[in-house]
Amino acid sequence: MAHKKGASSTRNGRDSNAQRLGVKRFGGQAVNAGEILVRQRGTHFHPGAGVGRGGDDTLFALQAGAVQFGTHRGRKVVNIVPVA
């Protein structure tokens, strides 16, 4: 086997771009319908009242209101509390 790989060959180039995951709107923040609340892989946060879940597990607001984080049956959930 060759101990040198040859012209125009490299052993580098394997660093991928960041996925920009995480919480995008924090507790108490006012949001409008359609705003992204959490970008995630898997369901680290589950959708609660007024929150929908996309095909890539992104959580988004279904209605306008304030973001509320909490737990339900041991799971972290995100709710939207309508502003009265």
UniProtKB/Swiss-Prot annotation:
InterPro entries: Ribosomal_bL27, Ribosomal_bL27_CS
Gene Ontology molecular functions: structural constituent of ribosome
Disulfide-bond pairs as recorded: none
Composition skew (Polar residues), residue ranges: 7-19
Protein's GO biological process: translation
Keyword Endoplasmic reticulum: no
Keyword entries, A-Z: Ribonucleoprotein, Ribosomal protein
Keyword Cytoplasm found: no
Residue stretches spanning the membrane: none
Region annotation Disordered: where it falls in the sequence: 1-22
GO cellular component: cytosolic large ribosomal subunit
NCBIfam families assigned to the protein according to its UniProt record, in alphabetical order: L27
Similarity comment text for this entry: Belongs to the bacterial ribosomal protein bL27 family.
Protein name: Large ribosomal subunit protein bL27
Gene designation per UniProt: rpmA
